[in-house]
Swiss-Prot record:
A GO molecular-function annotation: ATP hydrolysis activity
Annotated InterPro entries: DDX47/Rrp3_DEADc, DEAD/DEAH_box_helicase_dom, DEAD_box_RNA_helicase, Helicase_ATP-bd, Helicase_C-like, P-loop_NTPase, RNA-helicase_DEAD-box_CS, RNA_helicase_DEAD_Q_motif
Residue ranges of domain Helicase C-terminal in the record: 307-461
Source organism of this protein record: Saccharomyces cerevisiae (strain YJM789) (Baker's yeast)
Phosphoserine: residues carrying this PTM: S43, S45, S47
Record protein name field: ATP-dependent rRNA helicase RRP3
Comment text on domains: The Q motif is unique to and characteristic of the DEAD box family of RNA helicases and controls ATP binding and hydrolysis.
Amino acid sequence: MSKIVKRKEKKANDELTSLAEKIRAKALENQKKLIEAEKEGGSESDSEEDATAEKKKVLKSKSKSTVSTQNENTNEDESFESFSELNLVPELIQACKNLNYSKPTPIQSKAIPPALEGHDIIGLAQTGSGKTAAFAIPILNRLWHDQEPYYACILAPTRELAQQIKETFDSLGSLMGVRSTCIVGGMNMMDQARDLMRKPHIIIATPGRLMDHLENTKGFSLRKLKFLVMDEADRLLDMEFGPVLDRILKIIPTQERTTYLFSATMTSKIDKLQRASLTNPVKCAVSNKYQTVDTLVQTLMVVPGGLKNTYLIYLLNEFIGKTMIIFTRTKANAERLSGLCNLLEFSATALHGDLNQNQRMGALDLFKAGKRSILVATDVAARGLDIPSVDIVVNYDIPVDSKSYIHRVGRTARAGRSGKSISLVSQYDLELILRIEEVLGKKLPKESVDKNIILTLRDSVDKANGEVVMEMNRRNKEKIARGKGRRGRMMTRENMDMGER
């Protein structure tokens, strides 16, 4: 009997191996066609030179931006050709050159001048527009003259975004001796307390963990804070950080404090927050409605029932060699699809809320370093993360609200680069897609599909998916068993303690 089982397992493994080989062969064929087409000049090059040329082309077209608020900036087309025009300290100008910041983006052109003058700022801009540097540059420029500890505090909704903001400050402040620290949940509080006692200039934090340290870390306070930044403020409020923000705002000083509020969208909650925390702010907006950048090509793929996994593998094969983020609605789907991709020899890693901080940063590092070409993620990755050169975004699950769609597809076509998004649409997603198209103000074109390849892949992909689901179920059972074992040991110890009493 065991021999029969082994033969069946061997046959299944052979079939999966055969599928992977077929996919690799098809991928090599696609790559060969692409190379030949490039030689003939018939297709766009994905080389770094072409990306740079595309970027320059986009930057040459003036961005139509608006500024309207309590303090009006009436020059709607104001722009700068270089950061030296902003009258920054030489060390900061050189850091911008080192980072290949060729010229200020529209939001930077709008926000940095009034920020340098000392105004509070409300910055509204679409994702990928350079919001982080828009508030980091004026803070660092002022810090060069003051050099005080606990000088600025930046609040971010997620641990990943906080870490990326820290990286931006460290890079821009590399020639200025800037000390920064990242204070987020999921990490050791004692280690963070020691970092705070070293009196960094810049603190980047999630609201909950910052409040923990303000209440419990001896010797730490923000009484002399000069700058407060709330980045992705709409997300902060969506994640119900409102009560914590209120407590933080009551603790930190209001006099001699400059406050910046940056967000992708303006809502009634944001308006309430800015009235509570900002004084006569300048509102700098380069986008006052949900929209996507012109360099993003958005399409959809109509998927028959039960074939979504097959269509996904079809896409991975068609776009082999491209960097891709696949968005799912659930953590379980993120794990399952990551496993499916890897089983079929597409290098993938998962990012979702069940991972601890080290696991999440590890997944991001693998993807950013190019060691994994596919990131399968829930919406935890959709906001604020600066992941360079993402070629394609795939919506495996359609988001339930249009705002989430905008933020997801905003992971590609950043900073003037071109990019593509593809949404897999089943019959149950039609209403969601109609809402998204209404917000975008256009119909999304359909992606073409080779039905013969779909039919060829179907059985093998279903079988591979079954293998992944079985493995996930096995791991879950082991996890539950370990949990019961621990609870059993704890109950035994409690019974022994009761016996002693």
